[in-house]
């Protein structure tokens, strides 16, 4: 019997290899052969000997106890019982000990025979169909032709085989089943085959060349990995440990068992039957049938349903095979390795906690007691309330009064993590200091709701307790809500006042002409506030106040009160504070005063906002919604214009299409005029108007529908209906109007449901493609950069140059073109002020970018620039790839939810949104593709046989002709001068064409601009660098065109860096370098083409990825985050980087810590 195995220490290895298992290897892993299909004895409920749960093979079911009961207790550790043969050890070895089944006939492994492409078929140069005929005993295959006229590997039917037998006797050999294939595979000389294929490659072309390349790939894989081809045929089947395919007793004496046990049972039964038949010397046809059934049983065990009908259990449910255990959302990878359930956690409904400070959360008492139970028990013993842990536990369970005092002490300074699903970005998990509260609901600070996207209509949140000192330190320094004030996607504050707080601040800072006390002068702030408290002056009255520096300041009393919470470095805010203004105040405060001052400011605004929105006593009544008097006249005018247009159409002056467009235009203008009239007629202190203009709730569109007119609507197909809804909600809709409205509303809801799922899937793909992008280098020393200017959509500027420069590094120092003074240096990050100065004098600037970074795995600090979540230069080890993916994916869900609130009013509905982003990132051929010019030159347009053709004539008189498909609209005119890559027709450009014409830089700039366009049109700001990270990952690979003297295969995809390395070696040796062209991969393809097979397998197409990796004997270097999470190592980012591994964290006593608050993280 083998000795105790040492458990693998996760942190002790830095790469992981996968390969094919040889029969000897499988026997080495095994602790014994499983010979019987029995599982457990139904009377004694003990495992049957030599069965699938045998204790002799897999270890004892109870700790330190053998099967027959002769040896019990730990003192017999390691003894093998002489009666039952069971080793006395822990029962958990049943999770790791494997068994095996010796097969009476070899069978093929379905992954290698049936996968696409069939690896077995490629090696033997047979089609999968003929391979199937041989393996499943339909045809014979000639394994040795001897001196006959037969060919090796020729297929023969039963009758043909008999004829040849009669004709040639035993001069040739032919057989069927996996044995025949095994013989052929054993005979293979890979080196010889490799040379033959390389010669063939040079001679053939077309389909045959592609096939040769494919075969060569497989041959090389086997040659380099040390795997043998015959290992694809199995003589031995491994049996996984019984704890991984458990059998549990249900109440009522029945048993529930894993499907794998059924599948193993079928294999064992058929194998035993086959052995018996062979011993009896049964006729060939019976043996053959049994062998085929054994082959099918093993297929079902490995991958049920891959070939033929799946084996089903009760109720016609297909059984879950080994492959199914790994695949999909419920498979081993995604369910258990990438997402685990943890203890020390709880969940509850959330309610608002308006009195909390930004870094606090309210934790219900009973929940806190349960979460911190071990800490409380330890403290009770330490303080002498209990003698031992057991009595302390009893005290906690009985909830004695002293327990609460101890709990109070335990939770001070011990942060907890709060998480709300769905966690769309890193702000979905933040740390807070718990405050004990009565009741059973978690209390949440109102300002972190935006980050969590939480509201209080019944949302729930989960609480987790960081246990170790390290975890607590990270929670406090990195995850505390007061440190997460900025949004990583654009660097704007995410914790900024909303709703009531905005309304309160807006009301407080408004001015009311002619209010009580207007024009009074006060000697200082307190006197002014006193006048308000004693009702001598109104809150919104314009007054003058003497400043400490002696100046007279004209302001309102409300603004004086408001400024009492604004830190002095921000200055005096003497304007109406709506949502935008508040946002800017917070951003400025963070820039000038850091997160500490900002947290205080936010809490101050929160208190004031709530207080004064209550004081304001905002209500909404019917009288507040006043319909403007001009409305009737505006509608009458519009009706008149529509009638005129109809007349023109009837006379045949305009087409139906023109008429439709004109009518739509008339009504759109009418709606706008009504809206303007409405805004004009509303009182500035009208509660509805205040709510909309302050940005607290609602918008002008919704106001228009309440008091103006609803306007034009879309029908279910998205076409605008030319009959507008003239009424508003105040007046009420007619039946027809109501019916028209229902289309839009329904479409909004359906869209939301569908697109939320799409957005989630997009985020998942983005994370997967970029998860190994980490800041690994200080400076990569690149000499290339990208040229940036304003991003435009037609004439409109979507993103200004200034915004694109902030927080980046210049490629080289930049001087003022006239004065020659240095505007910014290449060694320092560009500040907001510098960016402003540069944009004043330059239209285009070259900056360092992730796109041109030369760091091999990841990016360097200089090319990345500022970390937007902190506002400082990015740290080493920051997982910028994940942040980028979250920053693009999280607003994706917002793109999806936008259509909902406007009730489907035409013109606001977007089809551009998410599908377009997906199309770009997947590098798909776009719908409505534009034709682009492949060369620079002048345009000439002509008609040929009723079709338009565009010629582009270059300066060297070269003429390129493009045929314009029917129905496309031209974008160029006769005589226009255009550049390569310019569009000739309207539509979206195919990025692959762009890559051919304009090269890598061109396609990078195009993708960046297009993605930005979609998001900006939705009003979502995302920083360029996040999109750059994705685009870089899409262009990581090159396709080898000619191999030269390298070992690369033509047509193979290879990483740019590997390609350059290979070429450098060959050139140094005086050989011919390989030639490759860049390829653009969609994010799904790029994720699957990653070096890490663990990451790819856990993403999609698990079996295909593992099949390929096993044949190649791939080594996973464990550089990304995902692979490390899967095997349970610390991730190589942040504090998990190797350079921080040996940092020790200790808990100090209170006295030793003087003042930690003054230390900036």
Swiss-Prot record:
Zn(2+) 2 binds at residues 780, 853, 860, 863. GO terms for cellular component: DNA-directed RNA polymerase complex. Binds 1 Mg(2+) ion per subunit. It is an enzyme of class 2 (transferase). GO terms for biological process: DNA-templated transcription. Residues 305-325 are annotated as: Disordered. Zn(2+) 1 binds at residues 66, 68, 81, 84. Mg(2+) binds at residues 455, 457, 459. The keyword Glycosyltransferase does not apply. InterPro entries: DNA-dir_RpoC_beta_prime (IPR045867), DNA-dir_RpoC_beta_prime_bact (IPR012754), RNA_pol_asu (IPR000722), RNA_pol_N (IPR006592), RNA_pol_Rpb1_1 (IPR007080), RNA_pol_Rpb1_3 (IPR007066), RNA_pol_Rpb1_3_sf (IPR042102), RNA_pol_Rpb1_4 (IPR007083). It catalyses: RNA(n) + a ribonucleoside 5'-triphosphate = RNA(n+1) + diphosphate. Keywords: DNA-directed RNA polymerase, Magnesium, Metal-binding, Nucleotidyltransferase, Transcription, Transferase, Zinc. It comes from the Bacteria. One of its GO terms (molecular function) is zinc ion binding. Its EC number is 2.7.7.6. Its cofactor is Mg(2+); Zn(2+). Signal peptide: none annotated. It holds the Pfam family RNA_pol_Rpb1_3. Belongs to the RNA polymerase beta' chain family. DNA-dependent RNA polymerase catalyzes the transcription of DNA into RNA using the four ribonucleoside triphosphates as substrates. The RNAP catalytic core consists of 2 alpha, 1 beta, 1 beta' and 1 omega subunit. When a sigma factor is associated with the core the holoenzyme is formed, which can initiate transcription. This is DNA-directed RNA polymerase subunit beta'. It comes from Desulfitobacterium hafniense (strain Y51).
